[in-house]
């Protein structure tokens, strides 16, 4: 029953959950700008931001994944119902950004767990520091077939 209701709801709207895993917050600002600002107004296309993983269709992850939040990110991912998609946004989410080499050229970091794809599967990658809202919207649109059609 719940799966059927979710499928019907997905035909009407898409819920995006934003998770910040560490960094400067520039990508978060651009994601919120892409969804809420009057210029882009993703809500007019029935794309909404949610903070409940059980309501989410697409998980947007920003920032390098710190060791402190890695397990929380896994748990959030597991709570999102199938089919789901993950969009990694920004240089930090894709490769660790400026935080990647925090341990130096010869060492590893005691703080950074790595890029998002080391923790959970990533379906779409949106590069940039910070990416433009148009690129973030394009990344979300690219993830839609997996969510809507289960592909």
Swiss-Prot record:
Binding residue positions for [4Fe-4S] cluster:
24, 27, 92, 129
Molecular function per GO: 4 iron, 4 sulfur cluster binding; metal ion binding
Q: Does the keyword Ribonucleoprotein apply?
A: no
Q: Domain of life here?
A: Archaea
- Extract the InterPro entries matched here: Complex_I_20kDa-like, NADH_UbQ_OxRdtase-like_20kDa
Q: In the record's cofactor note, how is the cofactor described as bound?
A: Binds 1 [4Fe-4S] cluster.
Q: Which Pfam families does the record associate with it?
A: Oxidored_q6
Name what cofactor the protein needs. [4Fe-4S] cluster
Q: Which UniProt keywords apply?
A: 4Fe-4S, Iron, Iron-sulfur, Metal-binding
Which family does the record claim for this protein?
A: Belongs to the complex I 20 kDa subunit family.
Please identify the protein, giving its name as recorded: Uncharacterized protein MJ1363
* Source organism of the structure: Methanocaldococcus jannaschii (strain ATCC 43067 / DSM 2661 / JAL-1 / JCM 10045 / NBRC 100440)
């Amino acid at each position: 029953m719940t799966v059927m209701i979710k499928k019907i709801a997905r035909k009407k709207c898409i819920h995006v959950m934003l998770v910040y895993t560490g960094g400067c917050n520039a990508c978060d600002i651009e994601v919120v700008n892409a969804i809420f600002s009057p210029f882009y107004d993703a809500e007019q296309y029935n794309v909404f931001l949610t903070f409940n993983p059980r309501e989410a269709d697409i998980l947007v992850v920003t920032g390098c994944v710190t060791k402190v939040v890695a397990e929380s990110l896994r748990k959030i991912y597991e709570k999102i119902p199938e089919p789901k998609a993950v969009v990694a946004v920004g240089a930090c989410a894709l490769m660790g950004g400026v935080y990647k080499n925090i341990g130096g050229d010869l060492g590893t970091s005691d703080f950074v767990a790595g890029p998002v794809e080391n923790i959970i599967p990533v379906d779409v990658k949106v590069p940039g520091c910070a990416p433009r809202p148009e690129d973030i919207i394009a990344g979300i649109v690219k993830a839609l077939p997996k969510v809507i059609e289960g592909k």
